[in-house]
Curated annotation (Swiss-Prot):
This is Branched-chain-amino-acid aminotransferase 1, mitochondrial. One of its GO terms (cellular component) is mitochondrion. GO terms for biological process: L-leucine catabolic process; valine catabolic process. The gene is BCAT1. Pathway: Amino-acid degradation; L-leucine degradation; 4-methyl-2-oxopentanoate from L-leucine (aminotransferase route): step 1/1; Amino-acid degradation; L-valine degradation. Its EC number is 2.6.1.42. Its cofactor is pyridoxal 5'-phosphate.
Amino acid sequence: MALRRCLPQYSTTSSYLSKIWGFRMHGTKAAASVVEEHVSGAEREDEEYADVDWDNLGFSLVRTDFMFATKSCRDGNFEQGYLSRYGNIELNPAAGILNYGQGLIEGMKAYRGEDGRVLLFRPELNAMRMKIGAERMCMHSPSVHQFIEGVKQTVLANRRWVPPPGKGSLYLRPLLFGSGASLGVAAASEYTFLVFGSPVQNYFKEGTAALNLYVEEVIPRAYLGGTGGVKAISNYGPVLEVMRRAKSRGFSDVLYLDADTGKNIEEVSAANIFLVKGNTIVTPATSGTILGGITRKSIIEIALDLGYKVEERSVPVEELKEAEEVFCTGTAAGVASVGSITFKNTRTEYKVGDGIVTQQLRSILVGIQTGSIQDTKDWVLQIA
């Protein structure tokens, strides 16, 4: 995955991509010199949709056409980015990501509206969250503009993989990792920013059905002073065994407690959690061990606009018994109703279905994301 010279701007190739792939770049600049190497002689892929069973999408990887990549220069700035065919990448065995876990991920979605527009939801927040994470992990990061441009190029190059309206979304995975070699414990000398996508539908196997969570009492997800508040790749490996055990017992996912006291709920494996009690919506405060989710932030703002009282604070695990509704939020999960939570062999059930607060919040959020509800907050970025 060799990159060209280090330039602050992207190379201009919108006319080439428009001619070959049948889409307009809408101001986004792509890297034709590298793309041409990969697509010359290839069959046209200008049909509106890829050959996918859109009615049976899950949340597993579907190989799309292109990915985007760029690398950092010696001064920490990033080179011009380029699109290449989706495929494997080459890494030095001494790369920082392999030896010392220097890596961050993001999760985003591109939606196709009923009017055919292709939309991104608050991409600048993902870009800023990656920059914050990069500071914590001692990494160089792309600028907000570079981040968004890379995401836009990825979506436009894979436009036929954006599902039809109401059939799902194109999940986007921006990655930032140490690709430079280092034998001793040290920050990498070079970083790679990469974006790929995959069409998806529901994150949980339950689909839109309510989730069944299990409270993990022994193994915490994050520790004070650690990396729980950023989207570091190292946050996810340690919870895989906990998730596997819970799912083998029939649970959808795991709800973790704080490492300090073991008495307060924090978050699910890859989602934030909310409790509904009357007109009050409660969620654990993001105090360094909990990821500040973008869906979480958006739901809080929507709830406040609707007149609900929102409390961000420590939430004792015993308070789960007082909730009328519980729901999870995340880019992958969306807004997912929780039907029950099991703690110390005691199962507490919650309201689910139509007419509940969770459904109201979900409908508004999805409406804004897909363009069916007017975006009065300037949250949505139209890219096609």
